[in-house]
Amino acid sequence: MIAWRTDDLSVALAPLKQSFSPRLVAKPNDLAPPPGECSGEALVSFSYAVSRILDGYSVLDPKLVKDQLEYGSYASVKDRFLYIEVYKAASTTMRILLRGLYGSPERKLFPGFNGDTLGSIYARESVPLPPITALEDKDQRELLEAPDVLRFTIVRNPYTRLVSAWRNKVVLCDPWIDDVYAAVRGETPPIGQQFPVEFAEFVSYLESTVGRVWDGHWRRQIDLTFPKSLSFTHIGKVETLQETIRILAGQIKYRSHIQIPNINEVVIRPSPKYSAALAARVYALYEEDFENFGYDAKSWPQDREDRSCPVSERCFLDYVIARNLIITRLNRECARLRQEHDAVYRFSLARVQNKLRAIIRPRHSR
């Protein structure tokens, strides 16, 4: 019988999280580098794209910027475009679309997805386009400055984007992100005794962590796109996604109609229970997103009646949350066993080496 440890979840999942986007595992206060570590000499080792962003956002951690571009940028020198993705803003849709347009390499499976088609799309290698950081500096500069290059991103109404992240990642205790439930309630719930984190509670959690590098699913969109430095020629919106797809098709001279993949449908849609007061708190957290991307401060969603479902919302949520908690604990045990295996393996190698030395030394002494 497995005895579950009570170690901090973030420590237990650290080895597995390394398979995911590095920007999702950022530590608190990583936004600004230590004093003296961002001198002109230090910037020499970074690519043109990273240096360009740091010129416009001097307080950012260079490594965080580099990691973010390596995972969330898609470049084509031949077709003259650069796409910067934003989580919870059609990013999965765009991955599937780009994968279809540029070929389909063998999917790299992520731990825990067990061959799931949608899950494996999140491996960076599943989209056969290089990040801009993988290009030569001259090509990076050309993509960032040439007037004929389509430099685009896709953003979303901050109100609905945050609700989407809450429904998909927080309510269901997603095992692949930091444990918001434990941060809000003080501990991870026992299986069968979970009470989903309400949207207002999630907003309070964000308010208490301002100044940290948030998970990419609810990080401010300006912190994912660096608009001051990347000189976008087109900023698309989830609400008018077909227009962005049309512009991309024209840029790459794709003559056929591009069908937008229909994904991320949810069976249950718990209400965020937006009020004017709650919306004002969300607006304060994402004010720069509203201002930079042209979203109305009064555009928060009104509650809508959930569509019918053969099971109750509470029953459905309990089932999915329990499943995710089990995955989390299995991941924790997997990480522990991996560490023990590595320790035993190293010890076994040392024993073999000692035996070989004992055999070889007498022969040399003859």
What is each residue range found by the language model?
Residues Q339-R366:
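Helical coiled-coil/dimerization "stalks"
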Residues I2-E340:
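Membrane-interface amphipathic segments in extracytoplasmic regions
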